[in-house]
């Protein structure tokens, strides 16, 4: 009898432990799979593609790759003598037409004062027409001069904002064409995180909710706030034909993968380029307030650690 009782006790204890372990694992798994978090997140920043508005030989490159520059700092300079000559020519044209316009204005004024008593109406009208033509030519010359001045100013390529020069691929002596991207500028203090959340987890994501960001390979946890949720993503199963009609994929997959929706997260503290744009991170949405780590249960802490490994 005593042996039977002992066996039953052992069996009951084992069964209870198995049930408790199953409950703990189940709760951890539910929390792990259904709570709003993702390992598919990336640091991003505002990037300006810098391209010259004029063409010519590069005479000087004033920065080096990955350099931190200030707004209006010179990045590189394009051959200026040619544009200076163009400006001088345009200014000479303006001066010529200014003198010519003054002469024609005086002549037209003189003929208008004399009137039809001294000359024919045709001669008076002709003088006025010549004056208007010269004035139009003067206006055109002034516009050409202003454009030449603008081109000369734009031979000096400056940084549009504070930031880091990256992917610098221009060198002194190269010929660069108008509109060709020469360098990218990553704006300082513009870093944010794009977290690609599965659609099944969007119920727990709202603008204003707090977020924890853990960069890949780091134990440091950054804080942030959900700024916005994308209003739409591309529908890969629907396209348009040549007439604009919808074309729907007739194949229905047995396993439906949850779509990922971009969620923009604003960082509380800018980390400069400590984590460059494009690097990955794990993001956890904690709700309206930051998570109190001291109140986390064991299985919740375990779930947080599991996130770092998949």
UniProtKB/Swiss-Prot annotation:
The chain crosses the membrane at residues 12-32. Signal peptide: none annotated. GO terms for molecular function: transmembrane transporter activity. This is p-hydroxybenzoic acid efflux pump subunit AaeA. The keyword Membrane applies. GO terms for cellular component: plasma membrane. It is found in: Cell inner membrane. Keywords: Cell inner membrane, Cell membrane, Membrane, Transmembrane, Transmembrane helix, Transport. Pfam families: CusB_dom_1, HlyD_D23. Belongs to the membrane fusion protein (MFP) (TC 8.A.1) family. Forms an efflux pump with AaeB. The keyword Secreted does not apply. It is a single-pass membrane protein.
């Amino acid at each position: 009898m005593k042996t039977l009782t002992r066996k039953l006790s052992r069996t009951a204890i084992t069964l209870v432990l198995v049930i408790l372990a199953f409950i703990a694992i189940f709760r951890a798994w539910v929390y792990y799979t259904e709570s709003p978090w993702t390992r598919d997140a990336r640091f991003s920043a505002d990037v300006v593609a810098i391209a010259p508005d004029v063409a010519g030989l590069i005479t000087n490159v004033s920065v080096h790759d990955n350099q931190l520059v200030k707004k209006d700092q010179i990045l590189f300079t394009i051959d200026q003598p040619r544009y200076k000559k163009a400006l001088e020519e345009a200014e000479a044209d303006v001066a010529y037409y200014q003198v010519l316009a003054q002469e024609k204005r005086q002549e037209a004024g003189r003929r208008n004062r004399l009137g039809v008593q001294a000359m024919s109406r045709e001669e008076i009208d002709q003088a006025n027409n010549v004056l208007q033509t010269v004035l139009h030519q003067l206006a055109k010359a002034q516009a050409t001069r202003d454009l030449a001045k603008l081109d000369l100013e734009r031979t000096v390529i400056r940084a549009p904002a504070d930031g880091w020069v990256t992917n610098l691929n221009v060198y002194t002596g190269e010929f660069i064409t108008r509109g060709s991207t020469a360098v990218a500028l990553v704006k300082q203090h513009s870093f944010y995180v794009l977290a690609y959340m599965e659609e099944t987890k969007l119920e727990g994501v709202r603008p204003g909710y707090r977020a924890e960001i853990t960069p890949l390979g780091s134990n440091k946890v950054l804080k942030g706030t959900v700024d916005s949720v994308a209003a739409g993503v591309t529908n890969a199963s629907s396209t348009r034909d040549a007439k604009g009609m919808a074309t729907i994929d007739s194949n229905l997959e047995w396993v439906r993968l949850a779509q990922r929706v971009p969620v923009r997260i604003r960082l509380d503290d800018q980390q400069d380029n400590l984590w460059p744009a494009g690097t990955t991170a794990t993001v956890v949405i904690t709700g309206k307030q930051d998570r109190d780590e001291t109140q986390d249960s064991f299985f919740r802490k375990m779930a947080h650690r599991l996130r770092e490994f998949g």
